[in-house]
Each structure stands twice: as structure tokens, then as C-alpha cells.
Amino acid sequence: MKSAEGATKKSGLLIAMGLGILGAVAVAAAPKMIRRGRRLDFDNKVVMITGGSRGLGLEIARKLLREGATVALLARDKAELRRAEEILEAFQSRVFTFECDVTDQAQVNETVARVELEVGKISVLVNNAGLIQAGPMETQTLSDYKRTMDTHFWGPLYATLAVVPGMKERNCGRIVNISSIAGLVSVPHLLPYCASKHALVGLSEGLRSELFKDNVFVTTVCPGLMRTGSHINAEFKGQNKKEFALFSMMDSLPVTSIDSAQAAGEIVEACRYGDDKLVITMQARAAEAFHALSSGFVSDMFGLVNIFLPGPGKDPKIDAVKGSQSKSSFSPSFMTKLADDASVRNNELGSN
């Protein structure tokens, strides 16, 4: 009798263990199955990309065009847009360009209406327009903070508010917000940039929760340094030549940055599956992890780094100077070659 009871208990235990293992496997597999179920085919989809005439925006456009998408590129500079059309000539029947300042809500609303009328219903919005201004805190003005907030926070919000009603009506959509690792971990000499990118991360994560019920998936992208060639058009204050040299070298070296085409590919994949968040580069993921463990320690370490960065100088330049006007013996040089080459490929040199 005892033997039979023991066998019954043993078999019950084995069944429970088996069910537990099956349950664990199901729980582990569920996210992947759900992700696969959200897969979006970009063929014949209309994608609107702000800041699409150069840099990362242009790289994302290339990737999407190869997958059959039709792209609407938005930028402020008509000449840049024209050059972008020439660069993408092989896909010209699926490339449309629109002049638009994303900091002007009326312009954004008008442009979205034009895109939907002239090109088609917008399935994907990529909020990519951005600016970078580097320099010590002492050289940054309130206008600098306002300008970056207008571009990195209000611009994406205006575009999102303009496209969301249509996406809700069709019960389908994707919104990709290009923030930065600086939107998760603040770094010295980029205060206005960091503050505005933090604001975009908060907006983007909240939008995902709000729009989930409408089958509109919002992806927050936080890249580390990328070789887009944007250092040429970045702005520098204080000792601008030293700031530019450091920035362009960090932006170029393979140990600190990633190829922009690779980054664009990762962004397109995250958009395809409606992922919640994408942090690009191993260095950026490490910074995020360390910051999560001890934000104070990371901030203090950056404080030590800041001691060795260029100061404001005896006569700080309050007016920002473009990278293309801040050249020195260090930049351009062999140490910045990869980023300099990217600036040619990604239409960053046109206005310089």
C-alpha cells in the first residue's frame, strides 16, 4: 500500500514538474510569438521621416526603400532635399520630399495633410529631425535649451498628433522616435541636447502605453555614437575647435561609434516588429546598465571627465560655430576619416 502511495506521489510530482517546465517554456516563448505576430511588411507602405534629407534619416530611407516602402522626406532646406532626391534616384518613383520646419505646428499639420493627399496614408512615422550643440554649461543660453526642446520634443509631438488620428482609424501604425543614449544618461557639454532627449524618451514611452490599445506601436530608439557624418553640421561653443576635434574623433573611431547603415538596419527591424525600445551600440547599453545600477556613481564619473574637457575659454564664444567652420590639425585627420567619409555619403556636406 505504501509502495503504491509512493508511486502515486512520485508520478504526481513528475507531472507537476513537467507542467511547470511546459509553462516556463510557454512564458519564455510568448514574447517572441507576440513579436512575430506584430511583424509589419513595409512593401507599399508610406513612411514619413522628419530630418530625412541627410544623416541617419537618409540612411533609414535607403533601408526602407529597398524593402518596397514609399518615403516622404521632410526637412527645412530645399537644396538638401533636392540632393537627397538625386542620391535616391534609383528609387525616384517612391521618393517624395517636403519642405517643413517641425518646430512649427501649422507647417507640420499642413505637410502631413499634403503627404496623405499626394502620397498616401501614413503607416509609419519616424521622428528623426534633430540638432547637436556642444559646449560647456557656461556657454549655453536659455535660447539653446528652447531651440533643442522645440526640435526634439515639440517637433515629434506635433508630428505624432498629426498622424495618430489616421493610424487609430485604420487600427494600425508605427511611430519611431529617435532619441539618444543621452536621453537616458546625461553627459557633459551637451546639456540642452540631453535635457531635450530625456523629454523625448518620457514622451515616447508614455505614447506607447496610450496607443497600444489602438494597435499603434511606438518605438523609442536611443543610439550611442554613430558615423552619420553629422559632426560637420553639429554646432560648437566655447573653444569650438577643441570641442569639434574631440567630438569628431569620438564620432569616427570604431571603438566608440557604429556605422550609420548598421544602425539604420537595427532601427528598421525594431520598427518592423513594434519593439518598445532599442539601445544601439554596446557602449550605450553598458552606459545604460551602469546608470541603472548607480546613477550617482555614473554622474560623478562624468563629472571627473568634465574636468579634462575644454573650458569655456577666456572669451567664450556665445554664438555657435558649425563643425565645418571649426577645423584644426586634429580634425579632419586620419582619426576622423570614417565619419568624414560618412558625411559625403549621407548628404551632410551640401551647405558647407
Per-segment meaning from a language model:
Residues 160, 196-199:
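Active-site helix of classical SDR
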Residues 136-137, 141-146:
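Substrate-binding pocket helix/loop in short-chain dehydrogenase/reductase
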Residues 213-284, 289-293, 299-309:
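SDR active-site lid
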Residues 67-83:
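Conserved glycine-rich Rossmann-like NAD(P)H-binding loop of the short-chain dehydrogenase/reductase
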Residues 78-80, 99-110, 142:
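The beta1-alpha1 cofactor-binding region of Rossmann-like NAD(H)/NADP(H)-dependent oxidoreductases
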Residues 46, 53-54:
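Conserved glycine-rich cofactor-binding loop
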Residues 180:
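Residue(s) in the substrate-gating loop at a strand-loop-helix junction
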